[in-house]
Amino acid sequence: MTAFPRTVMLLGSGELGKEVAIAAQRLGCRVIACDRYANAPAMQVADTAEVFQMTDATALKEVVQRHRPDVVIPEIEALAVEALAELEQDGITVIPTARATAFTMNRDQIRDLASGELGLHTARFAYASNAAELKKVAAPLGWPVVVKPVMSSSGKGQSVVQTPEQLDQAWEAAMANARGTSNQVIVEEFLEFDLEITLLTIRQRNGETLFCPPIGHEQERGDYQCSWQPAQMSDAQLQQAQTMARTVTDNLGGAGLFGVEFFLCGNEVIFSELSPRPHDTGLVTLISQNLSEFELHLRAVLNLPIPQLTTAPAAASRVILADRELKTVAYEGLEQALREAGTQVLLFGKPNARPNRRMGVALARGEDLSEVRAKADRAAACIQVLDGSARR
């Protein structure tokens, strides 16, 4: 039997990390929240906070070695992954593994693994290390194409390119938003897909893999805007997605929840990307499931049982975005947003705002998907993100 409390360190303290911290504390864990800026959302509910550049390998190793947590849970992509590998060799448990974190931080590594080594169905793709090479490799894929940095997060630096003349601009956008030291992009054929889904995949230490009902979602500028559960797909498509998700997560190893993304194109299921942690589209599970994706992640990480997973007939989420730069923030409209039954609003507690920054999410549940999607949209539309300095 494992004794509690356990010490959990979060590398990344945004809105997803905040929910992981809350789930961990409900299980009696001590939480250390780390990020590059002070007062990040998870720090507001953690026992201890550490502020440092997590791309700095020396700083990262010093903080982890000083606290010696039972588990280290990466929550963002911008990390010194080489330091995680060294820490793992020194006996620190990295979730799910240091290798999984490194692979999924780099689009080229996870794509080469999925398409090359594991034979999963992906969009056609190529890599380029400069603008001239990008023009050469993009043309055979047909137009339009999608250009992304191999290292970035939340869709940053992603462009849909309609003509060859737009490739220089796409290259500049990718380089301006790339994470780390990479100067490479991945260019993909543009898929005319019917639906994007996330399959939350829970890999347990007992070897059993569980799946949440699929989550449909829509993106703008590479960022999630809304999600709903369950996504409508055939049994055959779901079986294909589960088989691919199990294949890739088994290869990456470790324990925890993975967000595995797919495109549905007709009867085809095409692997897109993977996050070795709770997924932003999975925020809907806070209202849709008896155990949210954050609780499921912690149970798998801490080797706790998951005896039953139940889901509402229909649930949906809609993000709440800022529309301008704000040094401090305040909110209006919460009373109106919560008037409908089966509705919740989460405001993440981010200390400042910028255009299109995700500041919160509206959640709704009910019996009908179209009904709950509209209800979440109405609730989100009620919330205004305002200048906090004028309201003190």
From Swiss-Prot:
SUPFAM superfamilies: Glutathione synthetase ATP-binding domain-like (SSF56059), PreATP-grasp domain (SSF52440), Rudiment single hybrid motif (SSF51246)
Binding sites annotated in the UniProt record for N(1)-(5-phospho-beta-D-ribosyl)glycinamide: 15-16, 75, 280, 350, 357-358
Keyword match Nucleotide-binding: yes
Listed GO biological process terms: 'de novo' IMP biosynthetic process
GO cellular component: cytosol
Known pathway: Purine metabolism; IMP biosynthesis via de novo pathway; N(2)-formyl-N(1)-(5-phospho-D-ribosyl)glycinamide from N(1)-(5-phospho-D-ribosyl)glycinamide (formate route): step 1/1
InterPro entries to which the protein is assigned, alphabetical: ATP-grasp (IPR011761), ATP-grasp_carboxylate-amine (IPR003135), ATP_grasp_subdomain_1 (IPR013815), PreATP-grasp_dom_sf (IPR016185), PurT (IPR005862), PurT/PurK_preATP-grasp (IPR054350), PurT_C (IPR048740), Rudment_hybrid_motif (IPR011054)
Enzyme Commission number(s) from the entry: 6.3.1.21
Binding site for Mg(2+): 261, 273
Keywords, sorted A to Z: ATP-binding, Ligase, Magnesium, Metal-binding, Nucleotide-binding, Purine biosynthesis
Domain ATP-grasp residue range list: 112-302
One GO MF term attached to the UniProt entry: magnesium ion binding
Top-level division of the source organism's lineage: Bacteria
Family: Belongs to the PurK/PurT family.
Reported function: Involved in the de novo purine biosynthesis. Catalyzes the transfer of formate to 5-phospho-ribosyl-glycinamide (GAR), producing 5-phospho-ribosyl-N-formylglycinamide (FGAR). Formate is provided by PurU via hydrolysis of 10-formyl-tetrahydrofolate.
Name of the protein: Formate-dependent phosphoribosylglycinamide formyltransferase
Annotated source species: Synechococcus sp. (strain CC9902)
Origin organism lineage: Bacteria, Bacillati, Cyanobacteriota, Cyanophyceae, Synechococcales
